[in-house]
């Protein structure tokens, strides 16, 4: 999904644009599990005076995770603003902050990974707000699409391809839901991310499995606290 710089700036700055989200606000409890940690927390998506925010906050006896994305939504497009990661204990050393600057057309990273990347004429998403764009595209009935996601370690962005690979019945809290199965991949990469999106829950993620030869991370929905 590419835009010329002029069109891109128009999307951001024209006041006549529609500022809304097709995905309703929600709060839900998820469990994140990897080889290093298993932890449950609350993921929230909500509107603020300056746009939208999405966050995930979790903690247990040994660690705490905090992820925060600030962005705008205009004409069904997510416009990244900032992205923040805070992880404790400190020895995990993963704190990072991204700022998307549309005057200089740069994204700047501070923290464990310091770099400055060019936004060029592409829309670039962070690891949290991209999920709003994914759900919006699936809700629109798109079967395949491409999205640019920021490269947290090296800077810049990488283009990923998303393909709907099937429909499946998912069991959540004893109820049977219709789930869209979506796969994310990238050329010359062994990493694959599989999303299970429940139609009855406004295409909320029931499960996300991020698998590569090195590790597998899983995010699983435990409870919907609020929707809409």
Task: Give each language-model segment a name.
Residues 1-3, 134, 183:
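Short, intrinsically disordered low-complexity segments
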Residues 2-11:
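Sec-dependent signal peptide recognition
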Residues 13, 132, 136-138, 153, ...:
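Generic secondary-structure transition motif, activating predominantly at the C-termini of alpha-helices
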Residues 15-17:
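N-terminal signal peptide c-region/cleavage motif recognized by signal peptidases
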Residues 21-102, 142-228:
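Acidic, serine/threonine-rich low-complexity disordered tracts
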Residues 93-139:
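Hydrophobic, well-structured mid-protein blocks that either form specific transmembrane helices
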């Amino acid at each position: 999904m590419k835009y010329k710089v002029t069109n891109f700036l128009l999307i951001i700055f024209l006041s006549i644009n529609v500022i809304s989200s097709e995905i309703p606000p929600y709060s839900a409890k998820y469990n994140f599990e990897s080889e290093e940690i298993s932890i449950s927390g609350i993921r929230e998506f909500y509107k603020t005076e300056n746009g939208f925010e999405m966050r995930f906050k979790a903690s247990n006896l040994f660690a705490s995770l905090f992820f925060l994305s600030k962005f705008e939504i205009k004409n069904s497009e997510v416009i990244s603003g900032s992205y923040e990661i805070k992880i404790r204990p400190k020895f995990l050393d993963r704190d990072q902050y991204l700022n998307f600057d549309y005057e200089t057309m740069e994204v700047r990273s501070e923290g464990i990974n310091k770099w400055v990347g060019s936004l060029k004429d592409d829309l670039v998403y962070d690891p949290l707000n991209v999920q709003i764009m994914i759900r919006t595209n699936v809700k629109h009935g798109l079967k395949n699409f491409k999205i640019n996601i920021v490269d947290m370690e090296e800077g810049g962005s990488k283009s990923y391809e998303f393909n709907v690979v099937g429909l499946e019945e998912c069991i959540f809290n004893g109820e049977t839901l219709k789930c869209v199965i979506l796969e994310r991949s990238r050329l010359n990469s062994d990493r694959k991310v599989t999303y299970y999106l429940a139609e009855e829950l406004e295409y909320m993620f029931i499960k996300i499995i991020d698998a590569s030869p090195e590790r597998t991370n899983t995010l699983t929905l435990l409870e919907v606290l609020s929707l809409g």
